[in-house]
Amino acid sequence: MRLFFYLLSPFSLRLGYVFCDFIALIAIALNTKIVKISRININIAYSSKNREFRESLVKRSVKHSIRSYYETLFCLSRSQKKLNQSIFKVENRFLYSQTNKDSGLILLSAHNRSVDLLLNQITNQNDITAIFKPIKIKAFNEFVRKNRQKTGSNVFETNFRGVKELFSALKRGKVVAMAADQVPAKNMGVYEEFFGRKVYTTNLIPSLHSKTKAPIVSVAIHSDNLTNQLYIRYGCKSTFQEKSQYSAKTMNQEIEKIININPEDYNWEYKRFKKQEVEDNTIYK
């Protein structure tokens, strides 16, 4: 299976990006699904910006989304040494190192660049317990799960058992990680504002914090626009007194901050606004 992913990503990241950019040009010219959905989402998120800005962002976003797919293939087929070399620098690492051993640490992320590459880097530093949405093809799902666990971390599917494992890990003072920007399953979220729209949002991270008082640190991969080099950035450390509340709204605001660092790095092709408090069934049609 590793050979299969290697054959799909035979070049270095730098050379692979050239190939990805060519594919992006074709996708944009054909106005493919990834382009259409990205345009809808960007028009919602940045409605206050002019059309020229939004169209430019759509094109750059599609290019970087396709690059992120290549990064994932690269991550699934290369040695740890090669993967470590793919990250230019880490900003605010001290936030990660200040883990509270009594209550653990919650790493909040979003689908910025390759989630697999990010998970690889943070699990290479420490044992992590994380959850993920399973891949429909069973053979691929098993390979990806094992690859995410190769550094000794624990990865579980997004279900009742996975949630239980996150709570258990925090109670043992461990680190847990979750990308919290996707639409959750029925009865697993609340409607909260995200880029000006009340959308269905997971309340798992607020629940984890409420029950364990674990501090929350955001983390994501970003790209440098001048050099194309990748770097990891840890955001603000969110700690709250017992009477304070970390809500889904607070979480969405933090995710917006991650995205706004470099909006083209975000995977805008996901239908994030499909489930809104004010229902709109035509939004992606």
Question: For each of these PLM feature ranges, what is it?
Answer:
Residues R54, K136, F140, S247:
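Hydrophobic (often cysteine-bearing) scaffold residues that line and stabilize catalytic clefts
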Residues E55-K59, S97-K101, N124-Q125, F160-K285:
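Non-catalytic C-terminal accessory region of glycerolipid acyltransferases
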Residues T72-L73, H111-R113, I258-N262:
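Juxtamembrane/interfacial segments around transmembrane helices
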Residues K81-F88, K133, G152-E157, F194-G196, ...:
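Short, flexible loop segments at the rims of nucleotide/cofactor-binding pockets, characterized by
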Residues S103-F160, N187-M188, E192-E193:
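Catalytic core of membrane glycerolipid acyltransferases/transacylases, capturing the structured
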